[in-house]
Each structure stands twice: as structure tokens, then as C-alpha cells.
Amino acid sequence: MARSGLDRIDISPQPAKKIARVGGLQHPFVKTDINTINVEHHFIDTLQKTSPNMDCRGMTAGIFIRLSHMYKILTTLESPNDVTYTTPGSTNALFFKTSTQPQEPHPEELASKLTQDDIKRILLTIESETRGQGDNAIWTLLRRNLITASTLKWSVSGPVIPPQWFYHHNTTDTYGDAAAMAFGKTNEPAARAIVEALFIDPADIRTPDHLTPEATTKFFNFDMLNTKSPSLLVGTPRIGTYECGLLIDVRTGLIGASLDVLVCDRDPLTGTLNPHPAETDISFFEIKCRAKYLFDPDDKNNPLGRTYTTLINRPTMANLRDFLYTIKNPCVSFFGPSANPSTREALITDHVEWKRLGFKGGRALTELDAHHLGLNRTISSRVWVFNDPDIQKGTITTIAWATGDTALQIPVFANPRHANFKQIAVQTYVLSGYFPALKLRPFLVTFIGRVRRPHEVGVPLRVDTQAAAIYEYNWPTIPPHCAVPVIAVLTPIEVDVPRVTKILKDTGNNAITSALRSLRWDNLHPAVEEESVDCANGTTSLLRATEKPLL
């Protein structure tokens, strides 16, 4: 199989001037001056030059505007300031399967040349090349001017896209305070290791890459992670086995999503997502690390430490509930059978055994939230509790519940009103555009950890489970800088993909059409002043139509 034009990554800390492999994408996995590229200016310029009435051959203008914009960024990276970040000609090879293209393609030109299969091939290559996410400078560049799954706002009437979304650099998430976000960023590798060791079904992993009779290489994508993994084929050990890059909505080109953990086969040559014919579903996981439960196990005055000790000594559902309910605002919110859940927590329950004194219900549900509440109400979560680590062996194990099982089913499910659910719904929508025939299985992972004791500091902890043995030479490990795992909760989520698809597709297309008409009018009438919304801080000001907001 021929390799794509962008199938290699250089992880050298210094920008590479010499191209190691012909046809390969080269860029350092560090913050560099490529971030100074005026992404916003070019994107708005592309919008201004695009007719709202362009012929898209049954597709939408937004996707071709996005592709034209990405083409400009990638070709700019081929030679900025005499330093090569991507292979000269690789962008044309990716877009047009040729090394030459006379000039930057206009969206209408792309609409006349690219098929739906071409678009998916290009965007799947971009996803593969942007794994590493925040450590990947290209991920950061391409994510600008996108409405992302983690930043899209929702109102009672549905998703809300600001009128001037094209001015907004969507580079940071907006959920939670800075301390909570820092805790999540620090401990996400620990949660990822737990997902790999406990949550991923071995049946999802042991799937052959090559099913065709002419295939000569027979191995499994995830069997030999240090020798034949697609992660190494793209050149960086910092890319995890199930890591996902930037997925751009193939329907509108407006929305982007980067999944925390994606279990899907990849092409062994290019690293692009490539489910084999035997796959019927794709699992992905959104990780949330709960900073508000962080505690010192040796602090006798901390009630979390006391309830944690009780839970470890007597692992029952009642003691688990007591631990979770120890803090003022627990991660599980109770609502009565006749009440509605509030928006406070991502996990909810209406089970009488989980009733909490002083609970407050929420306002009336939107029709979509009520629908998703019905879909998820009968779903249960599974919980794993961890023993204290064995420092001599460098391992950590899960406790056995009274039933003898390592996981406990609890009557807790996802809250459709919470921002985490909305984020996962958007991720599901974006991923479904690439693989419409496959069942998508999203999960919310809740990680709770504790402070390390002095003798535990600096010790990596291998997650010692039977399932983890399939990883052989790359056993899932809690990095030494992470908290010691205490509890992990796995919550399946059911999303009505057709309904969410219609809502988000219509919203995205309307936002694109509105932007095209607005900017085209501004371009033709530069002296007109109008009220403009600064999406960065929500303020309103009068701006000349030819000026951009100061972000």
C-alpha cells in the first residue's frame, strides 16, 4: 500500500533542515515559531473570498473552506524561514496525489476535484499526524478557528456557535478551574494506563491488520508495541497506542474533536485509522480526573482518608458510597424519581440506596436531554478500587469485592445535562462521520487519586492485572509524577447519533453560511460599522467591518 504524503514525524528537539524520509511530514514535537503563522488572518481571508452559493456537489461549503485553509498552513510549513518542517511537495501529494500544484487551491476548486473518499483520506492523515495533541505544534495550529467538542457551548435551545466564531482561537478547554485542569493534565497518563489495563476488551485488540490473501506480514497492531506499532512508524514514543489526533468534522469542516483514548485498528504503513472488515464497533474513552478528591492518606484529620481506609478494609457498595459522599460536592449527584438532575455533576443516580440528604433537583429538561436521560437511565457504571501499591515490586493491583469480582456494578449513569456528556456527544458525532456503518461505544472514565506517601514518591507503578498481560513489553504503568490511583469508574454512554448529527450539522452549516454572507458583505462595504462580539471575553464593541477584534 502506498504511503500518504504525510506519514512521518520527526521528534528532534531542533527543527530539522534535512528530510530523513522522502515524502514525510517533519516537525518537532515542541512549541516552535510555527505558531506565529497568522492562522486567523488566512482563515478569514478564505471565508471572504468564498461565495455562499458555491457548488459543493451535494457536500457543504464549510469542508472545502477548511481544506483550503489547511492546505495553506501545511504548505507554509514546508519552508518557513528556511527551516523545513514538512517535506516540500507533501501537501500536494496528500491533496492531489501529485507533487505539483500551480497555486493555492480555492474552496470551489477543491469542491470540483475532491471526492468524499478523498476528503476522508486527507482528514484521516491529518488525524494520524496530529497525535500527541498539545505536544504537537501542528495539532495546535489546525485546531485554531475550530469549534471543538470541549469548548462548544449549549443552551436550552441547543448548541451555540458565536456569530464571530472565525475570530476565536479555540486552543484551550473551558471546563473547570486552573487547579482542576492542571490536576487532570498531570494525571491523565495514569488514567490512560488504567484504561489500557482494565477497560479495553482484549477482543478489541487481538484483531489482524492484514486480512487479504496477498498480505505477507502477519502481526497484530498492539502485540509488539516497541517494534511494529504504528506509533513508532510515525516516529515518536510519546504517542500512545490508543492516542487520537485531531478529527475534523467531515460534514461541515467546522467542528473538531480529539479523543483521549480511541480503540481502532490503524493501517500499519501510514498509521491512519483503518477498521478491518471484522470490526462492528469502535470504543473510545473520555477521561476526567477529579481533583476535589485528592487527599493525603496519612492525614488523620482528613475524613477522606478515614473513609478510604474503611473502604480498603471492607470493600462494599455502602462504603464506596460513603467515600464518594464524604466531600461537600461529590462526583455523583442524586435526584429523585420524580425530579430532574441538575447540571452540577457528570455522574448521577436516582437509586434509593444512593439518596443523599439535602439534594436539589434541576430545572425542566430540554427535549433532547430528556431523551438522552431515558437512554442512559438503565445503564450502570463499573467501579475498581486499588490496593496500596507494592513498592518493592513496583506494582499496583485492584481489590476484590465481596462477590470476588474486581469490578462492582453501581446504579450510576451519565448526566445528559452536564458538559462532559455534551462533549462526548460531539465527539461521537464527529467520529461517526468517518465510520457511519460502525457502532460507536463511548465511555466516561472518572479517575480519583491520592497523594503519594514519602516512600512512594518517584516510583512508577505497573498496573498488574490479567488483562494487562496482553501488552507484553509495554505494560500499562502509572508514571512517577502521577497520584496513586484510588478509584476508577467506567460509565458507558448512549448517544442518539442520528438526532445529534442533524442538530450539529444544521448548526454548523448555518454558522458557515452566516459567516460567508457577513464577511462577504464586510469585504464589499469596508466603511460600514457594526456591532461585533469578542468571542474571547464575551464583550461587545463597535468595530469597523475591515478590522478584527483584539483577542
From Swiss-Prot:
GO terms for cellular component: host cell cytoplasm; host cell nucleus. It comes from the Viruses. One of its GO terms (molecular function) is DNA binding. InterPro entries: Herpes_alk_exo (IPR001616), PDDEXK-like_dom_sf (IPR011604), Restrct_endonuc-II-like (IPR011335), Viral_alk_exo (IPR034720). Its EC number is 3.1.-.-. It is an enzyme of class 3 (hydrolase). Its main location: host cell. The record marks 188, 260, 286, 288 as: Required for function. Keywords: Endonuclease, Exonuclease, Host cytoplasm, Host nucleus, Host-virus interaction, Hydrolase, Nuclease. Pfam families: Viral_alk_exo (PF01771). It is found in: Host nucleus; Host cytoplasm. Plays a role in processing non linear or branched viral DNA intermediates in order to promote the production of mature packaged unit-length linear progeny viral DNA molecules. Exhibits endonuclease and exonuclease activities and accepts both double-stranded and single-stranded DNA as substrate. Exonuclease digestion of DNA is in the 5'-> 3' direction and the products are 5'-monophosphate nucleosides. Additionally, forms a recombinase with the major DNA-binding protein, which displays strand exchange activity. Interacts with major DNA-binding protein; this interaction increases the nuclease processivity of the alkaline exonuclease. Belongs to the herpesviridae alkaline nuclease family. This is Alkaline nuclease. It comes from Varicella-zoster virus (strain Oka vaccine) (HHV-3).
